[in-house]
From Swiss-Prot:
Domain annotation IQ: ranges: 206-235
Lineage top rank: taxon: Eukaryota
Signal peptide: none
Binding-site residues for ATP, renumbered to this chain: 569-576
PROSITE patterns from the UniProt entry: IQ
Bias (Basic residues): 464-479
Basic and acidic residues bias (residue ranges): 338-363
PANTHER family: IQ AND AAA DOMAIN-CONTAINING PROTEIN 1-LIKE, IQ MOTIF CONTAINING WITH AAA DOMAIN 1
Entry-linked Gene3D superfamilies: 1.10.8.60, P-loop containing nucleotide triphosphate hydrolases
Protein name as catalogued: IQ and AAA domain-containing protein 1-like
GO molecular function, one term: ATP hydrolysis activity
Family: Belongs to the AAA ATPase family.
Source species: Rattus norvegicus
Keywords: ATP-binding, Nucleotide-binding
Length: 822
């Protein structure tokens, strides 16, 4: 597509953005219980609109060439992504669950389930920093050094005699198979000759033979024509893809080449822009800098004189933390500036006096909070209040910049998509002015001291820096003591790789986690039934909680803080695959703190503390990082089994929880735990540590259908070869089986030999059922046990309580209606 196409897409996106910003709820708006459904609908609509905007901005940022527009697009893209995460948090608070049934909203907005897909910004992988690339290269080098040692340990020596015996066995087996095939053919020929001798050969006349040949040939031709006509009809109505695969592949290849060429142009234009930035800054500093400096000095001197004339003394110069001389240039009179400075001094005195009264106030505030909470509990109408957004100011600023600068500016002046020199000079002029202001402030402070000595005979008074606003002591973080001050981070990184705590993740994308969405979620909700999440919902939640937050520092800062996720589900549901997908999509390090992997490493009394310190220190420096804890129930065991007491799986628990609490906004470190048996863990500790708990049930029919279809196609089988395969029957039969089971059965059936036979022997559903029957499914009792545990989590309890309240209210309403009818 051309640059004009992306420009029009950008303009259309801003038109939509303007409408969406008008629909935003006001912050701290109370949400009443009776308004819950309407508020849920509003938030759902906003969520879907912002998802669409995220998709458009992602495409525009990836393909637009002009460097200044791309900077604005990047801020908008991060702001919209942050808003999507905030709305997701609001939906969880309203729905009291991690699964949101938006099928009714999709239908009313005339959208499709594809619009529910969370787009992952492409720049997460394309614009990885040099630090991340160097770290990946360092990991590859360390693993390459370790591979020969591991292979030497694993390989067992073999004598010449043993090798000869193995070769002889293989050769004899080959000759035996060949001999058996030859004898089978001889027996077939003998059997055929025997039948001919017994029955006699049927004799045909020339005409009869011709008729038989014509019949067979005409039947063959007619079947081919009917098959071709059916194929054309199915392609015409869109039920089958076009048979011309080469045309489609050529179109995709051409589009890929076009995208890559635009990305190459982006790099070229960015280099030009960086050179222009340096030249413009230097030019403005040389040409306009001296005039700016003199003008500022004159203004400040005039302010000194006016203040002295009004008050009889020279003013206190604003310090740098307050803005310095910027306060003087903000269109204020000397009297106003003096009043502001005096007000600041009085406030500082008041704060010092109020320090002694803080304890009394805290007690009163606690009492007030208790009374408010009691009132809120007594008042069932108020559910919660809308939280203020950190992303909307960023989005508003970006939208205003687009409206004021780029909306009315066309690309006729710069068809080559080069930077706009006028806009660049305006931006750099402000920067140069700020730099010169700092220099002028230093000079004028000294001049003010000299004036006080010469005119008022005052000695220099030390300027007190304004004290920071006092916050609650509980909110302050204690600075963590560095237990490895004499070690470089690179050496610590290498040490963790060598002992196996840092591992290389497999290249798995989030789209490889196959699943379909829940189509009847709203229907189940209206029937007061709790819908189970589909595999599509799990993939979306991982994209929201894991990928978007770890991919960008700005998004992580704006989004609600989520430090840990727990994935609960039976074996074979792809929990570890999701962890690796997060690492692949964001380029994150993978730390393995599973109890089995930690066993025997950093022993001793303080070994656990040192281990957590090194892991989190390296994870923070080389962020983004994912800390995976497999079989996490062992870390939170209620009672450690006898056979696992040597492992001591709970030894890192306290230090792990302490280190996790130190993570804040901007620390792109995510802890992801996986478990199949959460019932063995202490419920309170597990739920307190993991902030988000995602339950992965057995796949439903829609997900199983997509799994069978996609997994078979991924084995190199085209759509035409699977026409005779009843995938719907396979999806029905495989109820209770996990994606891992389905993949095992497909790999068992589709061997190399079977793939070669597809042209003569099409696939049949019974082939897969035979192998599937050999595997143990997830029994209903196991899933019910996991559900019962999940409903005991804090969010699960709230959901159950809310559902029961709704059922009771519905029963009461029906009872009233019956009484009225009587």
């Amino acid at each position: 597509m051309s640059e004009g196409t992306y420009q029009r897409l950008w303009e259309a996106s801003h038109a939509t953005l303007e409408e969406v910003l008008e629909k935003e709820p006001s912050p701290l708006e109370p949400v009443l219980t009776r308004e819950r459904q309407s508020f849920q609908y509003r938030i759902s609509v906003l969520y879907l609109y912002y998802l669409g905007l995220l998709r458009r901005f992602n495409l525009a940022y990836d393909q637009m060439v002009q460097p200044q527009k791309r900077r604005l697009l990047r801020r908008l893209l991060d702001g919209v992504a942050g808003r999507v995460l905030e709305l997701k948090d609001e939906l969880v608070r309203v729905d009291l669950c991690e699964t949101h049934c938006l099928d009714r909203v999709l239908q009313e907005l005339k959208l499709t389930p594809v619009d529910l897909e969370v787009p992952i910004p492409k720049y997460f992988q394309l614009e990885q920093t040099s630090t991340m690339k160097a770290r990946q290269q360092m990991l590859a080098e360390i693993l390459a050094r370790l591979e020969p040692l591991a292979s030497q340990e694993n390989l067992r020596g073999m004598s010449r005699t043993e090798a000869l015996i193995i070769v002889q066995c293989a050769e004899r087996a080959r000759q035996g198979r060949l001999r058996a095939t030859f004898m089978r053919e001889i027996r077939k020929e003998e059997e055929r000759d025997r039948r001919i001798r017994e029955n006699g050969r049927q004799k045909f006349s020339q005409d009869q033979g011709a008729i038989v040949i014509q019949k067979v040939w005409k039947g063959y031709l007619q079947r081919k024509r009917i098959e071709q006509d059916r194929r054309m009809e199915m392609e015409f109505i869109g039920m089958l893809p076009s048979s011309s695969q080469t045309t489609r592949q050529n179109a995709l290849a051409q589009a890929f080449v076009g995208e890559e060429s635009r990305r190459t142009r982006q790099v070229e234009k960015e280099e030009e822009f960086q050179e222009a930035i340096a030249k413009t800054h230097e030019s403005l500093t040389e040409t306009e800098g001296p005039d700016m400096k003199e003008r500022m000095k004159d203004q400040i001197r005039q302010w000194f004189i006016e203040c002295h004339a009004l008050t009889g003394r020279f003013p206190d110069y604003p310090d740098e933390a307050s803005g310095g001389s910027y306060l003087i240039f903000a269109d204020k009179t000397p009297e106003q500036v003096r009043q502001e400075l005096e007000a600041q001094a009085q406030e500082n005195k008041k704060k010092e006096q109020e320090k002694n009264k803080d304890k009394v106030k805290e007690k009163k505030e606690k009492k007030k909070k208790k009374t408010k909470e009691e009132k809120a509990k007594k008042d069932p109408e108020v559910m919660f209040k809308v939280l203020p957004s950190k992303s909307i100011p960023v989005i508003n600023a970006g939208h205003e910049e687009f409206t004021s600068i780029w909306k009315s500016r066309y690309d006729n002046k710069h068809p080559s998509q080069s930077f706009d020199s006028e806009t660049l000079r305006e931006e750099k002029r402000k920067q140069v002015e700020m730099e010169i202001r700092v220099q002028v402030d230093e000079l004028m402070r000294q001049e003010l001291r000299n004036l006080r000595l010469a005119v008022d005979r005052e000695e220099t008074r030390p300027l007190k820096s304004p004290k920071k606003k006092g916050g609650k002591k509980s909110g302050k973080k204690k600075k963590e003591k560095d237990l490895t001050p004499d070690r470089s981070v690179d050496s610590l990184f290498e040490e963790l790789v060598v002992i196996g705590l840092i591992k290389k993740s497999l290249l798995v994308t989030l789209n490889d986690y196959i699943g379909d969405c829940l189509y009847l979620g709203s229907t189940l909700t209206l029937a007061n039934k709790i819908p189970m999440p589909s595999l599509f919902d799990i993939r979306q939640n991982i994209a929201l909680y894991g990928v978007l937050r770890l991919g960008s520092h700005d998004i992580h800062t704006m989004a609600p803080l989520v430090r840990s996720i727990l994935l609960v589900g039976p074996s074979g549901m792809g929990k570890k695959m999701l962890v690796q997908a997060v690492c692949t999509e964001t380029g994150a390090n993978l730390f393995d703190l599973s109890p089995g992997n930690v066993m025997g490493k950093y022993p001793g009394k303080n070994g656990s503390q040192l281990l957590m310190h090194i892991v989190f220190k390296v994870a923070r420096v080389f962020q983004p990082s994912v800390i995976w804890i497999g079989n996490t129930e062992k870390t939170f065991y209620k009672k450690i089994p006898k056979e696992e007491r040597r492992m001591d799986p709970k030894r890192i628990k306290k230090d792990l929880m302490r280190a996790t609490r130190q993570l804040g906004p901007g620390d792109r470190v995510m802890l992801i735990g996986t478990t199949e048996r959460p019932q063995l863990a202490e419920m309170k500790g597990l739920c307190r540590f993991y902030e988000r708990i995602l339950f992965i049930p057995r796949p439903d029919y829609a997900s199983r259908y997509v799994l069978w279809k996609r997994m078979i196609e991924n084995q190199g089988i085209g759509v035409q070869q699977t026409q005779s395969l009843d995938i719907s029957a396979l999806a029905r039969v495989s109820d209770g089986y996990t994606p891992g089971h389905i993949l095992q059965s497909i790999q068992s059936v589709l061997t190399e030999r079977r793939l070669l036979q597809l042209t003569k022997k099409p696939l049949v559903a019974s082939e897969f059922v035979v192998h599937l029957a050999k595997l143990d499914p997830v029994y209903r009792e196991e899933e019910e046990s996991l559900k019962e545990w999940f409903y005991k989590t804090p969010l699960g309890k709230k959901n159950i309580k809310f559902t029961k309240d709704q059922q009771e209210a519905e029963e009461a309403r029906l009872a009233k209606e019956k009484k009225k009818k009587k």
